[in-house]
Amino acid sequence: MNHIKLIDCPIDVTYAINLISDPSCGASSIFIGTTRDSFQGKKVVSLAYEAYENMALKEMDKICSDLRATWPDLKHILIYHRLGTVPENEASVVIAASAPHRSAALKAVTFAIDQLKSRVPIWKKEIYEGNHDAEWKENSESIRPKKSLSSFNYSVCKVDESRVVSRNLVQIRANDCELKNRVECFFKRKRAEINSCNVIDFKQSNLSSNINSDTEVDVSCARTQSTISKQEQSNCHLKVRRATNRCGPQQMQFRPEYKHELSRLTASRVSTNEVGESLQNSRLHSIETYMGLTSKNNENIINRIKNVENRILLLESTSPEYQHFFEQSCMDQPEKKIKTNKTYSAHELRVYIHRKNKECP
């Protein structure tokens, strides 16, 4: 059984021994921590203990679990710690354990007091006699780091060098000093770029009238020796640029009415019978199949053509860039035949004239 408690009154050691006693145990080990009367030549009157009780009790219970996991033969475990002011020669902490054999009991008590000092959030203040100021003391077993993270010894960490990495896979091969120098140079360059790209809101004025306007002034004050320079056609001294989007939701209102325009241009004045006689249903059916439309052969052919046109119109309205933003390639244009004048020789001309004379008697 585990006996854990934080108390404000003096600890009864006899009562603690009776709690851990058991007929099946042949050994009981107990540790009693008391207040000593001096520290580094100063007279100690008392000790004042404070604790975060909820967390302290949880940690004490975890210590008991660790003890039972390490020494399963332990029968009873007792951890009592006193809070408040503890005068000299009075018990501030009592740790006891009982087991069938002395080895487990002795080792468990030693382990418990070390863990109590290092893990449980209990703080101690020493109160001295005379004019000496009271001091809060930290346990030497505390696991909290006493040094900053910058002083971490990286040489302790072992590096697995058994796996050799090809140098072709390493992009940065500089040492720490070179990397630090590169980072500093990068910061300086970016700072210079930002300074050069910043908008100049003010113009520097000359300090006195006798200074030439071409002479630069090393010392000036932007608050008292500058004037605001506004941009042309603007009420602000900062540059304002207007963005023009050629394609997007803002341009929807400027697009033509595709359906209305296509209906007007494709209106047919030919009767249904004449069109039905001139067109082949097989070719129209192939177009409808390719466009994903279904129709009957006995349906009005004008309505079928209209459905195909509406389908093409829908595709063009979904992605109008293909029709409006691409120019026709020169490869699509038909090649023009180049006419060349034939050149005749003198002999060919004589033969040609002689032949004509024979044809015309």
Swiss-Prot record:
TM regions (residue ranges): none
Keyword Nucleotide-binding: no
Pathway as given in its UniProt record: Cofactor biosynthesis; molybdopterin biosynthesis
Keyword list, A-Z: Cytoplasm, Molybdenum cofactor biosynthesis, Transferase
Disulfides per UniProt: none
InterPro entries referenced in this protein's UniProt entry, alphabetically: MoaE_sf (IPR036563), MOCS2B_euk (IPR028888), Mopterin_biosynth_MoaE (IPR003448)
One GO molecular-function entry: molybdopterin synthase activity
Keyword Cytoplasm: yes
A biological process from GO: Mo-molybdopterin cofactor biosynthetic process
EC number: 2.8.1.12
Binding positions (substrate): 101-102, 117, 124-126
GO annotation, cellular component aspect: cytosol; molybdopterin synthase complex
Subcellular localization(s) per the UniProt record: Cytoplasm
Reactions catalysed, as given in the entry: 2 [molybdopterin-synthase sulfur-carrier protein]-C-terminal-Gly-aminoethanethioate + cyclic pyranopterin phosphate + H2O = molybdopterin + 2 [molybdopterin-synthase sulfur-carrier protein]-C-terminal Gly-Gly + 2 H(+)
Gene3D superfamilies: Molybdopterin biosynthesis MoaE subunit (3.90.1170.40)
Any Pfam family: MoaE
Assembly description: Heterotetramer; composed of 2 small (Mocs2A) and 2 large (Mocs2B) subunits.
Function of the molecule: Catalytic subunit of the molybdopterin synthase complex, a complex that catalyzes the conversion of precursor Z into molybdopterin. Acts by mediating the incorporation of 2 sulfur atoms from thiocarboxylated Mocs2A into precursor Z to generate a dithiolene group.
Family statement drawn from the similarity comment of this UniProt entry: Belongs to the MoaE family. MOCS2B subfamily.
Remaining remarks: This protein is produced by a bicistronic gene which also produces the small subunit (Mocs2A).
Name of this chain's protein: Molybdopterin synthase catalytic subunit
Organism: Drosophila pseudoobscura pseudoobscura (Fruit fly)
Underlying gene: Mocs2B
